[in-house]
Amino acid sequence: MSHRRDVETDDGTRIAIHARRPDRPAEDAVVFVHGATFGARPAFDTPGYSWLADTASRGRAAYAVDAVGYGDSDRPAAMDDPAGDPPSRADRVADDLRRVLDSLARDHDRLHLVGYSWGTMVAGLACTRGTELSSLVQFAPVYDPDPARVSAFDPGPDPAPKRETTRANTRDRWDAHLPTPSDYRDPDAFDRFWTTLFDGQGVRDDPPTVEAPNGTLLDLTAAATEGPIYDAGGITVPTLVVRGSLDRTATRADGLRLYDDLAADDAEYAEIANGSHFLAIERRREALFDRVAAFHDRQ
């Protein structure tokens, strides 16, 4: 069963943490950070596809953090101010994550951090901000993408504070990664994922629509036009870079650039065959879960 706990930041913002724990006290905890569009529960705790539940079943506590503006965390006032700056930039979220990690460190001896997509930027920044970590996993990282891909991220010269994504848009995006979606994704996977997402971020039923803050897109655009927003050369903890072989968002070339820039003596790069950017909710998810758990077992 999942549980929720909250952490308050210095400015009073409430950050939600979704937790699954093993039956016995756990010395190790794994902390997950979601990507730019979908919050913690759809990314890591979709019923029947839960990476949190898998982690807890292996004896580690599992926590997934909702960044500000996502899921059950506080909604920034800037999201509803057309003249406001797009909220939820990685730099701010990394500071919030540090507060979360410091809180969890009181309950566990070892913390393992897992970033996903845009969440790898947050995780990369957090690694250099003082909290002691036992390892880092950068899953489906967007690190130093080809500048030719900037149109996939750029919210424009006068970006709105938030964006909307419909159910149809979300399914089309996922389908675009897969040669034949039914060969790679269970029949009920999308519906379960969308229901979990809409429960946390839904704003309209006709058509079914969710919202996300646009600060994340500014981070991705900056990485594509200016280079990485965090210093991989400052990351010294054991690190695994892992992606699905079909991922069109987190490319092989970009993942290898991150791997090559890491300062960690213990660094690995891995690919999971026949998985997309949504690998954690696809049929090959167990291969991902096993690979990450094996990496954690060594630390």
Predicted feature locations:
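N-terminal cap/lid segment of alpha/beta-hydrolase-fold proteins
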Residues: 1-23
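Conserved alpha/beta-hydrolase
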Residues: 47-76
